[in-house]
C-alpha cells in the first residue's frame, strides 16, 4: 500500500519538462541488497562512512529505459537492443547526458535523482577532456565502450533514516511507459513474499588466478623503475602506473559485491549490470562531487595496511603521517586538485578544507584531504568533471605528461580501472567516484587492477606489495588469498 503519492507535472516546474511520479511505501522489513536481488536491479548505489556509519540513501535502478554509449568520437542511443547514432550538437557523451537530465527538474527531495543517467567513463575517455595523445592501436582485451550510462524508468530509493522506500518513475521524450502501472507492479513484487532469489546467497565458489600474456609482477616493477626515471629526468613530479590481475570464477558479480560490501564497507559502493559484463566496487575515493554550486575533490594518497591490534594500527598511522615520501606525494595531488578546480571555480574560492587526516578501512588506511570551490555561474558539474578527469591520484603530475607515460608503459588499455562511476541530476549536480578497488566480471573472468604513486624514492618491491594490499579485499570477496 502506498503511503504517499506525488506526481510532479510539467506545468508545476516548466512547460517543457516531463512528469515524475514518486510513491512511498514502508520499508522496515527489507534491506537494499535483498531488494536488489529480488527485483533484479541493474544498478545499486550505496555508501558507508567509517566516521558516520551508513549513509542515508541507497539507490536501485530497476527498469532500464535506454542507454547511451560512446565509442571513439561517436555517441550511440541504445533502446530495446536497437542502436542509433546521436545526431546532435554535442562535444561528447557528457553533453548528451545533460540533454536528457534537463528533460526533468529536481523533485525537491534530498535523495539522489539520476535523471542524467548512471554509468562510467573509462580512463581512456580522458582524450576527449583535454589535448591528450593516446596510442589508438593499444590492445583492449576487455572490449568496452569509452563510456556507458544507463537511464531508468523506475528507481527504488531506500531511506535508512526513516525506513521508507521511494519508488520513482521517469519518462523521457525518447522513451515512455505507463509509470503508474510500472510502480504498482514493483510495489506488488516487493510485497509478494517470494524471496527465493536469495537462495544462492553465500554459496561456495572456486577461484584461481589466470596467466596473462606477460608477467604482471615483473612488468609492474619495470614500469615503476621507468616511471621513477621520468621523475629523475624532471619530466614528472609523480606517475601512477598500474597492474592487472585476472581471476577465473563462476561467482556471480552480485554475490561478489555482497561479500565485498560486508567485509569492506566504504563511502562509495556500487554494482552496475550492463548485461554482458558487471562492474562493482567498494572504495573510499570520491572523484568530484558538485552540489549547490560547490565542487569538492578529496585526494587520497598515502597507504598503509591495517594493524593486527589497536597499538599496531596507531603505530602504522604515525609511521604513515611521518613518511616524507607519502606526504610529498599527497601534497602534489592536493595541489593538482586545487589547479583542476581553479579552472572552473570562481577566483579566490578554492581552498583546502581539511588536510592530512587518516581514514581507515578493512585492510588499509589512507591520508586524505578535502579541496572545495564555488563554481563559476556558467559552469555545471559536467564542467567540473571534464576539468578534473582523470584524477591526479590515478595518473600523476603534471597530469597530461603522466597519462602519456602511462599509455606508453602499460601493455593494455585500462578501460574501467581509474575511470569514474557516477550519476547526474537535472540542476547540473553530480556525484562521481574513482573506479579503484573495483572489479569487472565478464564471462567467467573477474578483472582486478591496482596501482600506486611513484616518486623519486619509490621502491619497486614495496610498490608491488602495495598493489596486492589494495586488491586484497576484493580478492578475498572472491575467496582468493593473494
UniProtKB/Swiss-Prot annotation:
SUPFAM superfamilies, A to Z: ADC synthase (SSF56322)
Annotated keywords: Amino-acid biosynthesis, Aromatic amino acid biosynthesis, Lyase, Magnesium, Metal-binding, Tryptophan biosynthesis
Catalytic activity, EC: 4.1.3.27
One GO BP: L-tryptophan biosynthetic process
Cofactor(s) needed for function: Mg(2+)
Annotated transmembrane regions: none
A GO term, aspect molecular function: anthranilate synthase activity
Record's function text: Part of a heterotetrameric complex that catalyzes the two-step biosynthesis of anthranilate, an intermediate in the biosynthesis of L-tryptophan. In the first step, the glutamine-binding beta subunit (TrpG) of anthranilate synthase (AS) provides the glutamine amidotransferase activity which generates ammonia as a substrate that, along with chorismate, is used in the second step, catalyzed by the large alpha subunit of AS (TrpE) to produce anthranilate. In the absence of TrpG, TrpE can synthesize anthranilate directly from chorismate and high concentrations of ammonia.
The protein, known as: Anthranilate synthase component 1
Amino acid at each position: 500500500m502506498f503511503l504517499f503519492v506525488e506526481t510532479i507535472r510539467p506545468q508545476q516546474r516548466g512547460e517543457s519538462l516531463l512528469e515524475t511520479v514518486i510513491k512511498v511505501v514502508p520499508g522496515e522489513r527489507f534491506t537494499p541488497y535483498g531488494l536488489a536481488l529480488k527485483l533484479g536491479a541493474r544498478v545499486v548505489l550505496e555508501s558507508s562512512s567509517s566516521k558516520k556509519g551508513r549513509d542515508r540513501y541507497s539507490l536501485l535502478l530497476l527498469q532500464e529505459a535506454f542507454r547511451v554509449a560512446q565509442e571513439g568520437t561517436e555517441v550511440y542511443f541504445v533502446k530495446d537492443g536497437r542502436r542509433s547514432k546521436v545526431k546532435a550538437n554535442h562535444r561528447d557523451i557528457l553533453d548528451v547526458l545533460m540533454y536528457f537530465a534537463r528533460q526533468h527538474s529536481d523533485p525537491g527531495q534530498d535523495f539522489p535523482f539520476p535523471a542524467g543517467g548512471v554509468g562510467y567513463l573509462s580512463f581512456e575517455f580522458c582524450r576527449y577532456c583535454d589535448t591528450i595523445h593516446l596510442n589508438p592501436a593499444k590492445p583492449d582485451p576487455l572490449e568496452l565502450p569509452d563510456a556507458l550510462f544507463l537511464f531508468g524508468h523506475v528507481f527504488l530509493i531506500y531511506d535508512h533514516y526513516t525506513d521508507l522506500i521511494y519508488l520513482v518513475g521517469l519518462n523521457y521524450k525518447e522513451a515512455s511507459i505507463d509509470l503508474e502501472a510500472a510502480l504498482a507492479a514493483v510495489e506488488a513484487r516487493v510485497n509478494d513474499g517470494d524471496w527465493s532469489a536469495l537462495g544462492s546467497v553465500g554459496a561456495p565458489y572456486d577461484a584461481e588466478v589466470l596467466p596473462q600474456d606477460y608477467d604482471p609482477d615483473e612488468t609492474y616493477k619495470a614500469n615503476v623503475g621507468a616511471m621513477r626515471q621520468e621523475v629523475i629526468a624532471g619530466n614528472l613530479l609523480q606517475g601512477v602506473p598500474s597492474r592487472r590481475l585476472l581471476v577465473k570464477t563462476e561467482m556471480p558479480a552480485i554475490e561478489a559485491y555482497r561479500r565485498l560490501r560486508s567485509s569492506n564497507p566504504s563511502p562509495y559502493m556500487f554494482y552496475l549490470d550492463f548485461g554482458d559484463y558487471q562492474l562493482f566496487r567498494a572504495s573510499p575515493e570520491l572523484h568530484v562531487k558538485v552540489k549547490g554550486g560547490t565542487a569538492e575533490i578529496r585526494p587520497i594518497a598515502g597507504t598503509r595496511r591495517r594493524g593486527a591490534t589497536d597499538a599496531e594500527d596507531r603505530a602504522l598511522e604515525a609511521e604513515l603521517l611521518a613518511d616524507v615520501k607519502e606526504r610529498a606525494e599527497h601534497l602534489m595531488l592536493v595541489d593538482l586538485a586545487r589547479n583542476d578546480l581553479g579552472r572552473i571555480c570562481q577566483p579566490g574560492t578554492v581552498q583546502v578544507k581539511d588536510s592530512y587526516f587518516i581514514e581507515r578501512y578493512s585492510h588499509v588506511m589512507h591520508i586524505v584531504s578535502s579541496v572545495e570551490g564555488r563554481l563559476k555561474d556558467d559552469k555545471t558539474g559536467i564542467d567540473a568533471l571534464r576539468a578534473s578527469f582523470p584524477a591526479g591520484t590515478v595518473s600523476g603530475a603534471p597530469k597530461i605528461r603522466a597519462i602519456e607515460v602511462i599509455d606508453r608503459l602499460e601493455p593494455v588499455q585500462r578501460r574501467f580501472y581509474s575511470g569514474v562511476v557516477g550519476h547526474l541530476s537535472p540542476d547540473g549536480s553530480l556525484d562521481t567516484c574513482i573506479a579503484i578497488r573495483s572489479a569487472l566480471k565478464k564471462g567467467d573472468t573477474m578483472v582486478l587492477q591496482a596501482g600506486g604513486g611513484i616518486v623519486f624514492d619509490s621502491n619497486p618491491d614495496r610498490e608491488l606489495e602495495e598493489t596486492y594490499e589494495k586488491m586484497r579485499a576484493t580478492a578475498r570477496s572472491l575467496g582468493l588469498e593473494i
